[in-house]
Design a protein with these regions (language model features):
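N-terminal catalytic or cofactor-binding beta/alpha core of small enzyme domains
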Residues: 1-160
């Protein structure tokens, strides 16, 4: 929440009106009302569930700053690449998507916050999956992508 990118003024070329001239008290109110409760709930779940793996899922636009993105599924990791390595190896058997490591973002972009704050301290294997949003635009596409990912997540988990 303290990062300059937590409440950016723009997204790509678009101004985010709610973040323009945002007072420090308003920023802190957002952190208190939204971020802290989410972080506390997630921390509690990680401990209670004793899960072996943490996956965060996001989507990204096919075009960014006028550049067409070729990657269709990004497999992002920070310092712990165990699951990313296994997932990338597993998906080599099914090449229907352009899947790339640390694309369209990288840890240096500050996108692995949840993984570094909740998975790494508990020794959990972890990964952030980024899906190009034109591939999940319809309910049918979403179901198909969920099935694809679920299959390969289970098989990759068996590899680590």
């Amino acid at each position: 929440p303290d990062s300059a990118t937590a409440m950016p003024l723009t997204s790509e070329n678009q101004i985010i009106p709610g973040n323009v001239d945002l007072a420090e008290t308003s920023k802190q109110q957002r952190v208190t009302n939204y971020y802290r409760p989410f972080e506390a709930a997630l921390s509690e779940r990680v401990v209670l569930m004793g899960m072996p793996l943490m996956i965060t899922v996001h989507s990204f636009t096919p075009v960014f700053l006028g550049e067409h993105r070729q990657v269709e599924i990004g497999v992002l990791h920070d310092e712990d690449s165990r699951f990313a390595d296994a997932f990338l190896q597993q998906t080599l058997t099914d090449s229907r998507f352009n899947i790339q490591r640390n694309q369209p973002y990288a840890p240096t972009d500050g996108v692995t916050h949840t993984l570094t704050h909740h998975a790494l301290p508990h020794g959990l294997a972890n990964v952030m999956l980024e899906i190009r949003n034109d591939l999940i635009a319809s309910p049918l596409q979403q179901q198909e992508m969920a099935a694809y990912l679920a299959k390969h997540i289970v098989l990759a988990l068996e590899r680590i």
